[in-house]
Regions:
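Active-site acidic-Proline motif in GNAT/NAT acetyltransferases
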Residues: 102-108, 139-140
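Residues forming the Rossmann-fold NAD(P)(H) cofactor-binding site
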Residues: 112
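C-terminal "cap" of GNAT-fold acetyltransferases
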Residues: 129-145, 149-175
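Acetyl-CoA-dependent GNAT
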Residues: 2-104, 115-117, 121-127, 161
């Protein structure tokens, strides 16, 4: 059975040992970098939720999430002053920042189960109200796209004209 536990003194070393396949390394940051980013965000007062993903008592993956109460579009300069910016400016949302399942535990359904658990957690709105859950993925990561879409995520059509060739693709799921 899949469950999430906050990253803590008892499990952080197991989280740091998790690895994806060589082919997947371009899709996700190493977990040490993710935990450093979590620390920095927390130091700036930003809410971050870093969880070890367990199958029974074994750590099989990692997920990190956050909250933003004022969408600015600053990650995509070309969006500023666009219709996209006007529509999304000031929106509150939760985001799935990092997500990975160790290469030894892939293709067992753990990823989907873990995302369902993560979305259930975010639906409790632990940092405040929001309309959406967002995430992004590399455009060449078809496995991730299929998984995310199976859980109700979609790519807003209005984002497409503003992507640069090497941008990650953003997807959203309404609460």
């Amino acid at each position: 059975m899949i469950h999430l536990e906050k990253v803590n003194w008892d499990n952080y070393e197991d989280v740091l040992k998790l690895k994806v396949t060589k082919e997947q390394e371009e899709f996700v940051a190493d977990n040490d970098i993710s935990l450093i980013h979590a620390f920095l965000a927390l130091s700036d007062g930003e809410p971050v939720y870093a969880f070890a993903i367990y199958s029974d008592d074994k750590v099989v993956g990692f997920i990190q999430m956050g909250y933003d109460d004022d969408w600015t579009g600053e990650e995509h300069e070309s969006w500023l002053n666009s219709d996209v910016y006007k529509k999304w400016e000031g929106k509150k949302y939760y985001f799935i920042w990092r997500f990975m399942i160790d290469k030894k535990y892939q293709h067992k359904g753990y990823g989907k189960e873990a995302l369902i658990k993560a979305m259930e957690f975010l639906r409790t709105k632990p940092s405040g109200d929001a309309e959406y859950i967002t995430l992004s993925y590399e455009r060449t990561n078809e496995v991730a796209k299929k998984l995310y879409f199976s859980l109700g995520f979609y790519e807003p059509e209005e984002f497409a004209p503003y992507y640069e060739e090497d941008d990650e693709i953003s997807a959203i799921c309404k609460f």
